[in-house]
A protein has these predicted regions:
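Nucleotide-activated chemistry modules centered on ATP-dependent adenylation/adenylyltransferase
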Residues: 1-238, 244, 250
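Composition-driven recognition of long, low-complexity, acid-poor segments enriched in small hydrophobic
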Residues: 230, 234-274
Length: 275
C-alpha cells in the first residue's frame, strides 16, 4: 500500500493508495499519530489549557514553548484518538483530492480557543475571527504565508484577541475533544444579567419595547404583502377626501392584495388590476 505523507509540527497528512477512492474507509494502517477511537482508553483525560492574549501557553498549569505545547497536545490527543480528519479538498490547480489528516493538538487548541473567545470577546469581533479563519487557512495552504493580507489578518487577530486570556478545561475521550468549562479575568459573562430569575441589574420588562422594534421590519413586510397596509392607505386617503391620491394608490393596493402568480396568468392579472 503506497501512501504519500507530509508531516510538520501541526499535523500529518496521508494521500494515495486506497485513499484515492473516496468511497473507501481509511485503512487502520494509515494512521500514525492517533489510535483508533474504539481502542482509546475507557477513562477520559481532562486537561486545562491556558491562554494569554489568544495564544496557548500552558498545559495543566505548566508553561511550554509553542513548539513543546503543540507536541505535548499531539501526544495526549493522539493517545485518546483525537484529531482524525477525512476530507475531499480543492487543490489550488482546480482538482479535488481526498486526504486524511491527523492533528490532535490543533483539534484541542481550536476547541479551547473558541470556547474562551465566546467568553471574552464581543459578538462582532468573535464573528469576524470566524469569518477570517477560512481565508487565513487558504493563504497558508496555498503557500502565501508572506502575503500582505496574511500580515494584515495577524494584526486584526492580535488586536481582537488581546483579552482572550484564561483557562479552558477540555475532556479527551474516544476521539473527541470537548470543552467542559472556561474562566477568565476578562470574562464578559455576567450572571446578574444572564439569570432567568430576579435580577437587580436587568428588568425583563425592558424587552417588550425591544421586541416590538426588532420585529418591525417583518411586521411591515407581512402587512404590505398581504394587502392589509396598502388597503388601509387607500381607505384613509378616500375618507379624507383625497380622491386623486386614493386613485393613485388603488392600483398598487390591488397588486399588493393580489395573489402572486407567474407567466401569462400574471400578465393578465396585472392588466386587469391596472385598467
Amino acid at each position: 500500500k503506497i501512501y504519500s505523507r507530509d508531516r510538520n509540527l501541526w499535523h500529518i497528512s496521508h494521500e494515495g493508495g486506497a485513499l484515492e477512492d473516496p468511497a473507501n474507509s481509511p485503512p487502520e494502517d494509515v494512521w500514525m499519530l492517533t489510535v483508533s477511537p474504539e481502542k482509546a482508553p475507557d477513562e477520559p483525560r481532562i486537561l486545562t489549557l491556558g491562554f494569554e492574549a489568544g495564544v496557548p501557553v500552558s498545559v495543566d498549569g505548566k508553561k511550554h514553548s509553542p513548539e513543546a505545547l503543540v507536541a505535548k497536545l499531539n501526544e495526549l490527543g493522539g493517545f485518546h484518538g483525537v484529531g482524525r480528519v477525512d476530507i475531499c479538498e480543492n487543490r489550488l490547480v482546480g482538482m479535488k483530492s481526498r486526504g486524511v489528516y491527523e492533528t490532535p493538538g490543533g483539534t484541542i487548541i481550536l476547541e479551547a480557543v473558541r470556547t474562551l473567545r465566546a467568553l471574552t470577546m464581543d459578538r462582532d469581533s468573535a464573528r469576524m475571527c470566524e469569518k477570517l479563519m477560512p481565508d487565513y487557512a487558504d493563504l497558508v495552504y496555498t503557500g502565501r504565508w508572506f502575503a500582505p493580507l496574511r500580515e494584515a489578518m495577524d494584526a486584526y487577530f492580535r488586536e481582537a484577541t488581546r483579552f482572550v486570556t484564561g483557562d479552558v478545561r477540555v475532556k479527551l475521550y474516544k476521539g473527541t475533544a470537548t470543552a467542559l468549562g472556561a474562566s477568565s479575568p476578562y470574562s464578559l459573562y455576567s450572571e446578574d444579567l444572564a439569570t432567568f430569575g430576579p435580577s437587580a441589574k436587568y428588568d425583563h420588562a425592558d424587552s417588550k419595547g425591544f421586541v416590538r422594534l426588532y420585529g418591525l421590519p417583518g411586521m411591515v413586510a407581512a402587512q404590505v404583502r398581504s394587502g392589509k397596509r396598502a388597503g388601509k392607505s387607500v381607505s384613509k386617503a378616500a375618507s379624507s377626501g383625497g380622491g386623486k391620491t386614493a386613485k393613485a394608490l388603488l392600483p398598487s393596493a390591488k397588486l399588493a392584495a393580489a395573489p402572486i402568480k407567474t407567466g401569462k396568468a400574471a400578465k393578465k392579472r396585472a392588466k386587469q388590476v391596472l385598467t
